[in-house]
UniProtKB/Swiss-Prot annotation:
Transmembrane segments: none annotated. A probable role in capsular biogenesis. It is likely that the caf1A molecule binds F1 antigen subunits during the extracellular secretion process. Its main location: membrane. This is F1 capsule-anchoring protein. Gene3D superfamilies: 2.60.40.2070, 2.60.40.3110, 3.10.20.410, Outer membrane usher protein FimD, plug domain. It comes from Yersinia pestis.
Length: 833
């Protein structure tokens, strides 16, 4: 009680004491004692900077959404003058803000700068020293975040472009006996043309022995509002319900890539706790399916692009302190499964397009639909037909919880093959998946042809041959009776993985069948070694009852040599292969990478034990460069030698010229960093900007934000980019421009003096004419450090709001630099009156 009274008295005494605070301001005369004039420091006294264009990181509700240059202007809010960002409605949409809910955002009839405070309970903070712009909005003002799918308004159809992926190969073999040689030449060309939303694609191959062959040619475009895709030309029918067939016609179908994955397919939820701000990597079968940055604390990744199937996800949490957390997440999905309420469809019609030109022209059509029901059920079905073929299918998929996942469907087909009677039959199909916590994964698929009268569409149409081609138009009347396949995988903690797989197919009326099975084991050791064991057997019985079988075993061992050769990417391996005929082959090799992973090399020697023993040697090289990829191989043994060379890459023609690079996928970013040559893009071996500062960056994911990155370490000494990461959101098949703001020029320590012989005030903003962002700030000795200066330039200096509080000067870089590689110069700044 005594202490309570003492604390109470002390508290009352302190509460009666006044508290003084003081606002500190800049004295302009102290800042510029040599200039003799009053400097406008009112903005600095308010904790502000001069208005202008600044590079900032943008955060919405604490989450970083963008980085870039933003124009800041002086505006009054609540009676205070503030530096206020000028943001467009398109930028807010990109940041994930639902602008349609707030029509008052657009002020004065223009979309140049929206009224950010039109969103109730919102707040804007600009932290100049941190280069951070923070926007706080209520949760209901945000657009839903669906699996990385960006708002439709931000989808970029790209620029007009003509491009081509190419792959060429030449092999020549010389035989020691007789001196004969055998040459083989191959080329594959995949040209494409983009005009607006339309995509024109083709694929053509050429063999020396067979000549030219076209695989496909078609035009397609996205129908964004209905999340579908229209295709005209040579394509394939949907394969989820009926067997896919090649057609030439029209197809319209749901485009799953436009829709958040979790809305249409089942996927597991990955949960964990990050100790620091971390990068969470999720792998499926060794391939990365998700790579997300998360803040410290609990996290949840619910929308993973797995594409069906079952198995185990490996989750690696890369903490910012360099440590890792690793755990696994098992999952099951049925063969056909949609989320509740999601509808998917596919319609097509046209001519059947077989691989040979001996089959008669037949018109076909197909319709397929799938719908997600409550209680983890999916109903699906479809129709397929031609002049002599009609089929209908109906199926259902279900999640069974602890019992796994299953889907089953039945197809009724009525058909008539050429010069045969009409037939009718059914096919049942069942798929089952189950994963156990013990690390066991079971996948069983069974197709049972319940009646002999069932035929597939392609099997029926292939019997109708063109006139006078009967002898060349061969087809097999054999009908599959049933087919069963299974895959079983068992993880052994600390000891690797064991895999089993089997397959059997039987036919009606005769004894023909195909049976195969395989057993495999693999283990990766902590020291980098790896061991793989495989045993497989295949047995075929033809219609005459003749049996052939093949037994094959393989041992593969790899171990790193870095322990003895230093920190080099060099490995050695041993492989033994044995077959049922008694042939045993041993192979040893050394392989690795060099020149910043651009060159892959592989040297091998092989020895055969059986009969006439022989050895063979082989050398393989592969180089990935700025303008493409080149490979070569050479091998020889006692009977022959072989030499080969291959070249592949990509070429894009746009309004910016011709850009050659490594082979890309269908969706491409044209990287533009003017005049910056040799900069690495995306950390992919050999992918660098060409002599103009351009390159092709492929394999982008459509309708999602893709980050294209230039490695700043690889920039030339005289180059600078304001931001080394550019975000693009392409539509499927687009060629989008990834533009980097680049400056090429010298680094300069510049001492400024005004034309009235007074020093330039401390804190003055210096910009280079023709550039929107500030380049430097004048120090206390009228000095400023500038980068990216051309040989000749004009600088603009401003230290106040009035015109007479600015000056300009023409700068010509000296001939020589100092020891640090920077120029040093003094110049007079001409006052603007």
């Amino acid at each position: 009680m005594r202490y309570s009274k003492l604390f109470l008295c002390a508290g009352l005494t302190l509460a009666t004491l006044p508290c003084w605070g003081r606002a500190y301001t800049f004295d302009s005369t102290m800042l510029d004692t040599n200039s003799g004039e009053s400097i406008d420091v009112s903005l600095f006294n308010q904790g502000l900077q001069l208005p202008g264009n600044y590079f900032v990181n943008v955060f919405v509700n604490g989450r970083k959404v963008d980085s870039g240059n933003i124009d800041f202007r002086l505006e009054k809010h609540n009676g205070k003058e503030l530096l206020w960002p000028c943001l467009s409605s398109l930028q807010l949409t990109k940041y994930g803000i639902d602008i349609d809910k707030y029509p008052d955002l657009i002020k004065s009839g223009t979309e140049q700068c929206v009224d950010l405070l039109a969103i109730p309970h919102s707040d804007v903070q600009f932290y100049f020293n941190q280069q951070k712009l923070s926007l706080i909005v209520p949760p209901q003002a945000l657009l839903p975040r669906f699996d990385g799918i960006m708002p439709m308004q931000l989808w970029d159809d790209g620029i007009p472009a003509l491009f081509m992926n190419y792959n060429t190969n030449m092999q020549t073999r010389k035989f020691r006996e007789g001196g004969k040689s055998l040459d083989s030449y191959y080329a594959q060309l995949q040209p494409g043309l983009n005009i607006g939303a339309w995509r024109f694609r083709s694929s053509t191959s050429w063999w020396k022995q067979q000549g030219w062959q076209r695989s496909y040619i078609y035009a397609e475009r996205g129908l964004n509002t209905i999340k579908s895709r229209l295709t005209l030309g040579e394509t394939y029918s949907d394969s989820s319900i009926f067997d896919s067939i090649p057609i030439k016609g029209i197809k319209i179908a749901s485009d799953e890539s436009m829709v958040p994955y979790y809305q249409w397919n089942f996927a597991p939820v990955v949960r964990g706790i990050a100790r620091t701000q971390a990068r969470v990597e999720v792998l499926r079968d060794g391939y990365t399916v998700s790579n997300e940055l998360v803040p410290s604390g609990p996290f949840e990744l619910a929308n993973l692009p797995l594409g069906g199937g079952s198995g185990e996800l490996k989750v690696i949490i890369h903490e910012s302190d360099g440590t890792k957390q690793v755990f696994t997440v098992p999952y099951d999905t049925p063969a056909v499964a949609l989320r509740k309420g999601y509808f998917e469809y596919s319609m097509m019609g046209g001519e059947y397009r077989p691989a040979n030109d001996l089959t008669q022209t037949s018109y076909v059509g197909a319709l397929g639909m799938k719908y997600g029901l409550p209680r983890n059920l999916t109903l699906y079905g479809g129709l397929q037909g031609s002049q002599n073929y009609h089929a209908a299918a109906l199926g259902i998929g279900a999640m069974l919880g602890d019992f796994g996942a299953i889907s089953t469907d039945v197809t009724q087909a009525d058909s008539q093959k050429n010069k045969q009677k009409k037939e009718s039959g059914q096919r049942w199909r069942v798929r089952y998946n189950k994963y156990l916590q013990s690390g066991t994964s079971l996948n069983i698929a069974s197709e049972e042809y319940a009646t002999e009268g069932f035929n597939k569409l392609a099997d029926t149409l292939n019997t109708y041959c063109k006139p006078n081609t009967r002898n060349d138009c061969r087809f097999d009347y054999a009908k599959p009776k049933n087919k069963v396949q299974f895959n079983l995988s068992q993880s052994i903690p600390g000891s690797g993985t064991l895999n089993f797989s089997g397959y059997r197919k039987n036919y009606w009326r005769d004894s023909r069948s195909t049976t195969s099975f395989s057993v495999g084991y693999n283990h990766f050791f902590r020291n980098g070694m790896s061991l793989t064991l495989n045993l497989s057997k295949t047995q075929n019985i033809n219609k005459y009852g003749e049996k052939t079988s093949e037994l094959l075993s393989n041992i593969w061992l790899s171990f790193p040599l870095s322990r003895w050769l230093g920190n080099n990417s060099i490995n050695s391996n041993y492989q033994m292969t044995s077959d049922s005929h008694g042939n045993t082959t041993h192979e040893v090799g050394v392989y690795g990478e060099a020149f910043d992973r651009q060159l892959y090399w592989d040297v091998r020697e092989r020895f055969n034990e059986k009969g006439r023993k022989y050895t063979s040697n082989a050398l393989n090289l592969n180089y990935r460069g700025t303008y493409g990829e080149i490979s070569g191989n050479y091998s020889y043994d006692q009977t022959q030698s072989q030499l080969g060379i291959g070249v592949n890459g990509n070429m894009v023609i746009t309004q910016y010229g011709i850009t050659a690079g490594q082979k890309t996928g269908d969706t491409i970013a044209l990287v533009q960093a003017p005049d910056i040559s040799g900069a690495s893009v995306g950390y992919w071996p050999g992918m660098k900007t060409d002599f103009r500062g351009y390159t092709n960056y492929g394999y982008l994911t459509p309708y999602r934000e893709n980050k294209v990155e230039i490695n700043p370490v690889t920039l030339p000494n005289d180059a600078e980019i304001t931001n080394n990461i550019v975000s693009v959101i392409p539509t499927k098949g687009a060629v989008v421009l990834a533009k980097f703001n680049a400056r090429i020029g010298g680094r300069l320590f510049l001492h400024l003096k005004r034309s009235d012989n007074k020093p330039v005030p401390f804190g003055s903003i210096v910009t280079i004419e023709g550039q929107s962002s500030s380049s430097g700030i004048v120090g206390d000795n009228s000095g400023v450090y500038l980068t990216g200066l051309p040989k000749k330039s004009k600088i603009l200096v401003k230290w106040g709001r009035d015109k007479n509080q600015s000056c300009s000067s023409n700068v010509v870089l000296p001939e020589k630099t100092d020891i640090s590689g920077a120029y040093r110069l003094s110049t007079t700044c001409i006052l603007n009156n």
